[in-house]
C-alpha cells in the first residue's frame, strides 16, 4: 500500500479581484500503465478533477475541470520483470482552493499493487513399488489465462430532470460502472452492467 499526493490546477476564467469560493470538488483516478521492475512497480495514470464555485456576489454557480498525471513507484519485495500485476487505485480525499487566478486541487490517492508469478508444477498421480508410504493430500487450484484484451464502449442515455430544478447548465459530471455478469460467447465475452 502506498499513498500519493497529486496537485492539479487550472486557470479560473474571468477571475479578477472578486472572491472565488469553491463549493464542491470531486476527483477520479485512472491508472493507464503498470510496469513491474526489480522489487518495485511503477504506476502511470491521470487524475481528473472538477469543482463548482461561486465568483464574487454572483448568484449563479460556475464549474471547471482540471487534470494531472500520476507517476508513482510502489516498493514490492520480490517483484521481478515479467510478473503479472494487479493494481487498485482510489481517491481518498480531494480539496480545492483558489490561488492567484488558479483553482488548485490536492488529491490524496491510495494505491495497492500485487504481483503474481506463474510457475510450472508437476503432478504425481500414481506411486508403485513402494510399501508403507505416508501420503498427505492437498487441494491444488490451477488457473490458465486463455485470453487478454481491452475494449472501449460508449454508453449514452438521458435522465429527465424535474422542471422545479431549473437546470440549464451541467456543472459537474461523474459516473461509475458496475459489472453484473460476464458470459462467454463465440469469439468473445458479453459483459452486462449498470452505469
Language-model segments: which ranges?
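Viral structural modules
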Residues: 1-194
Amino acid at each position: 500500500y502506498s499513498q500519493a499526493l497529486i496537485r492539479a490546477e487550472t486557470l479560473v476564467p474571468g477571475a479578477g479581484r472578486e472572491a472565488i469560493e469553491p463549493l464542491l470538488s470531486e476527483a477520479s483516478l485512472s491508472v493507464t500503465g503498470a510496469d513491474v521492475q526489480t522489487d518495485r512497480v511503477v504506476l502511470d495514470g491521470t487524475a481528473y478533477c472538477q469543482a463548482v464555485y461561486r465568483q464574487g456576489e454572483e448568484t449563479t454557480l460556475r464549474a471547471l475541470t482540471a487534470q494531472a498525471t500520476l507517476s508513482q513507484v510502489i516498493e514490492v519485495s520480490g517483484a521481478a520483470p515479467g510478473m503479472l500485476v494487479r493494481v487498485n487505485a482510489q481517491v481518498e480525499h480531494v480539496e480545492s482552493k483558489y490561488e492567484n487566478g488558479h483553482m488548485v486541487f490536492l488529491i490524496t490517492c491510495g494505491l495497492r499493487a500485487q504481483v503474481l508469478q506463474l510457475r510450472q508444477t508437476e503432478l504425481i498421480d500414481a506411486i508403485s513399488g513402494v510399501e508403507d508410504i505416508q501420503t498427505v493430500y492437498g487441494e491444488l487450484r490451477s488457473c490458465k489465462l486463455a485470453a487478454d484484451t481491452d475494449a472501449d464502449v460508449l454508453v449514452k442515455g438521458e435522465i429527465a430532470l424535474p422542471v422545479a430544478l431549473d437546470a440549464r447548465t451541467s456543472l459537474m459530471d461523474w459516473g461509475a460502472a458496475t459489472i453484473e455478469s460476464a458470459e462467454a460467447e463465440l469469439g468473445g465475452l458479453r459483459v452486462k452492467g449498470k452505469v
